[in-house]
Amino acid sequence: MVPTPQSDLPLNENDSQEMVLYEVLNEANALNIPYLPQRNQLLPRNNILRPLQCIGKKYRGVRRRPWGKYAAEIRDSARHGARVWLGTFETAEEAALAYDRAAFRMRGAKALLNFPSEIVNASVSVDKLSLCSNSYTTNNNSDSSLNEVSSGTNDVFESRC
């Protein structure tokens, strides 16, 4: 076994690959050329303290607009990869959640999502609940799919979902 001068790792003299590595290390050590620039030469001082606002998490199906809003879209495989516009959102997370909902509706459990499926399922059920809880005030109109709830002078109908 031959120890290397710069480290204490033993090398097997009978292994040709290790001997080639040993020769390369010795040659590089003999040249003593600094191959990496000094740390203070890498970045100017003002760039080191720059805030990391530019570095944001990338979400599937989400693009950032130049003016700061986030656009969400998904490709529909049933229409040969046509883009389906999902909307513009204030935050990347909202846009990613819109993408996840659409992906889950299109592809089911096989969809590649940005967030865990439990979060997507919960947001879909919350959306469904908010749509179902909308009340409609009418004047004695009856519909077989609506439940009648009496509220003061007007009749309020809530839809069953």
Curated annotation (Swiss-Prot):
Give the residue interval(s) assigned to the motif Nuclear localization signal.
57-65
DNA-binding region positions on the chain: 58-116
GO process terms (BP)? defense response; ethylene-activated signaling pathway
Q: Where in the cell is it found?
A: Nucleus
Extract the PROSITE patterns matched here: AP2_ERF (PS51032)
Which Pfam families does the UniProt record give? AP2
Q: Name the gene that codes for it.
A: PTI5
Which organism's genome codes for this protein? Solanum lycopersicum
Q: Which UniProt keywords apply?
A: Activator, DNA-binding, Nucleus, Plant defense, Transcription, Transcription regulation
Q: Which PANTHER family match?
A: DNA-BINDING DOMAIN (PTHR31190), PATHOGENESIS-RELATED GENES TRANSCRIPTIONAL ACTIVATOR PTI5 (PTHR31190:SF173)
Q: Kindly state one GO CC term assigned in the UniProt record.
A: nucleus
Q: Which InterPro entries match?
A: AP2/ERF_dom (IPR001471), AP2/ERF_dom_sf (IPR036955), DNA-bd_dom_sf (IPR016177), ERF_plant (IPR044808)
- Protein name as annotated: Pathogenesis-related genes transcriptional activator PTI5
Role, per record = Acts as a transcriptional activator. Binds to the GCC-box pathogenesis-related promoter element. Activates plants defense genes. Can confer resistance to Pseudomonas syringae tomato by potentiating the transcription of a set of pathogenesis related genes, downstream to a defense signaling pathway involving PTO and PRF, but probably independent of ethylene, jasmonate and salicylic acid.
SMART domains xrefs: AP2
Transmembrane domains' residue ranges: none
Example of a GO MF term:
DNA-binding transcription factor activity
Q: What is its induction behaviour?
A: The stronger expression mediated by Pseudomonas syringae tomato during an incompatible interaction (avirulent T1 avrPto strain) than during a compatible one (virulent T1 strain) requires the resistance PTO-R as well as the Pseudomonas resistance and fenthion sensitivity (PRF) gene products. This induction is independent of ethylene (ET), jasmonate (JA) and salicylic acid (SA), and subsequent transcription of PTI5 does not require de novo protein synthesis. Also induced by Xanthomonas oryzae strain PXOA avrXa10, by Pseudomonas fluorescens strain 2-79, by PTO and by cycloheximide.
Q: How does it assemble?
A: Interacts with the Pto kinase.
